[in-house]
């Protein structure tokens, strides 16, 4: 695997590649990331992974400084997965001067759900991803469904800017007990890790209830929030939304997704499940 720390080096390698798939990450890789790499390998001649902890998407009281940075272990995992190139720039390479131009996603997409609780987050995500797409110029870009709202925002960005890039979603990879794999799971204490699968269990319960014909969505959401609170969680939201735009359902036959975000101790976990 070739490791590139500069835009010039990465672009030179890209020019020699055929059909390219890009998998952007912030590092601290787990099996969910590796599943995306393998999915990418099936859709392109060359897989390029990026690792960059993007300051722009972190709020002032979030975990930018303590976000796990495990570059050597990540390199070993990527090599084992057969990734051809790693783009691992430092902050001065990605932002040689303060970023003055940004991507502002449509307010209807980012004032809800995670955007309500993390103002500015999706602006930072969209800005760095557009920059990565311009640097790499991939044919395909892959993003995990665990970050469902992010996937929607980035898919819409690529479409509305008419970028010649196919956006592919990757299914959420879970531990045996159902917990969605996340780089932030490492923040959990042993007791919190034992409790954490409750979030997925509640999403499954909501999915099954809706499939069985229960359309009292507010009741389902409220009961699940109460269940989390009763077990020591601090939920931000549990919401049943349309898959297409993450707005509240209008018709009973709308394809739906249930999304959740909640704090367990000091760790904020997110998850979702299509219905």
From Swiss-Prot:
<dbReference type="GO" id="GO:0004592">
    <property type="term" value="F:pantoate-beta-alanine ligase activity"/>
</dbReference>
<dbReference type="InterPro" id="IPR042176">
    <property type="entry name" value="Pantoate_ligase_C"/>
</dbReference>
<dbReference type="GO" id="GO:0005524">
    <property type="term" value="F:ATP binding"/>
</dbReference>
<feature type="binding site">
    <location>
        <position position="150"/>
    </location>
    <ligand>
        <name>(R)-pantoate</name>
    </ligand>
</feature>
<keyword id="KW-0963">Cytoplasm</keyword>
<keyword id="KW-0566">Pantothenate biosynthesis</keyword>
<feature type="binding site">
    <location>
        <position position="173"/>
    </location>
    <ligand>
        <name>ATP</name>
    </ligand>
</feature>
<feature type="binding site">
    <location>
        <begin position="181"/>
        <end position="184"/>
    </location>
    <ligand>
        <name>ATP</name>
    </ligand>
</feature>
<feature type="active site" description="Proton donor">
    <location>
        <position position="33"/>
    </location>
</feature>
<comment type="subunit">
    <text>Homodimer.</text>
</comment>
<dbReference type="Pfam" id="PF02569">
    <property type="entry name" value="Pantoate_ligase"/>
</dbReference>
<dbReference type="GO" id="GO:0005829">
    <property type="term" value="C:cytosol"/>
</dbReference>
<keyword id="KW-0436">Ligase</keyword>
<feature type="binding site">
    <location>
        <position position="57"/>
    </location>
    <ligand>
        <name>beta-alanine</name>
    </ligand>
</feature>
<comment type="function">
    <text>Catalyzes the condensation of pantoate with beta-alanine in an ATP-dependent reaction via a pantoyl-adenylate intermediate.</text>
</comment>
<feature type="binding site">
    <location>
        <begin position="144"/>
        <end position="147"/>
    </location>
    <ligand>
        <name>ATP</name>
    </ligand>
</feature>
<protein>
    <recommendedName>
        <fullName>Pantothenate synthetase</fullName>
        <ecNumber>6.3.2.1</ecNumber>
    </recommendedName>
</protein>
<comment type="pathway">
    <text>Cofactor biosynthesis; (R)-pantothenate biosynthesis; (R)-pantothenate from (R)-pantoate and beta-alanine: step 1/1.</text>
</comment>
<dbReference type="GO" id="GO:0015940">
    <property type="term" value="P:pantothenate biosynthetic process"/>
</dbReference>
<keyword id="KW-0067">ATP-binding</keyword>
<keyword id="KW-0547">Nucleotide-binding</keyword>
<dbReference type="InterPro" id="IPR014729">
    <property type="entry name" value="Rossmann-like_a/b/a_fold"/>
</dbReference>
<comment type="similarity">
    <text>Belongs to the pantothenate synthetase family.</text>
</comment>
<feature type="binding site">
    <location>
        <position position="57"/>
    </location>
    <ligand>
        <name>(R)-pantoate</name>
    </ligand>
</feature>
<feature type="binding site">
    <location>
        <begin position="26"/>
        <end position="33"/>
    </location>
    <ligand>
        <name>ATP</name>
    </ligand>
</feature>
<dbReference type="InterPro" id="IPR003721">
    <property type="entry name" value="Pantoate_ligase"/>
</dbReference>
């Amino acid at each position: 695997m070739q490791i590139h720390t500069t835009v010039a080096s990465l672009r030179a390698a890209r020019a020699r590649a055929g059909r390219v798939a890009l998998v952007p990450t912030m590092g601290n890789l787990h099996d969910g990331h590796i599943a995306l790499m393998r999915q990418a390998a099936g859709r392109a001649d060359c897989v390029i992974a990026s690792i960059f902890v993007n300051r722009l998407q972190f709020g002032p009281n979030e975990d930018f400084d303590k976000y796990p940075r495990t570059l050597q272990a990540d390199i070993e995992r990527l090599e084992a997965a057969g990734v051809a190139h790693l783009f691992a720039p430092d902050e001065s390479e990605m932002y040689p001067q303060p970023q003055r131009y940004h991507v502002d996603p449509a307010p209807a997409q980012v004032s809800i759900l995670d955007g309500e609780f993390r103002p500015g987050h999706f602006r930072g995500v969209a800005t760095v991803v557009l920059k990565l797409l311009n640097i790499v110029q991939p044919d395909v870009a892959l993003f995990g469904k665990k970050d469902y709202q992010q996937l929607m925002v980035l898919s819409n960005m690529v479409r509305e800017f008419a970028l010649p890039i196919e956006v592919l979603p990757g299914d959420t990879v879970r531990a045996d007990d159902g917990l969605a794999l996340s780089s932030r799971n490492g923040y959990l204490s042993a007791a919190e890790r034992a409790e954490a699968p409750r979030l997925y269990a509640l999403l499954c319960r909501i999915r099954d209830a809706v499939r069985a014909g229960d359309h009292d969505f507010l009741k389902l959401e409220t009961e699940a929030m109460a269940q989390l609170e009763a077990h020591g969680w601090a939920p931000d939201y549990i919401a049943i939304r349309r898959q297409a735009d993450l707005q509240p359902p209008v018709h009973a036959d709308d394809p739906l997704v249930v999304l959740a975000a909640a704090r367990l101790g000091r760790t904020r976990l997110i998850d979702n499940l299509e219905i």
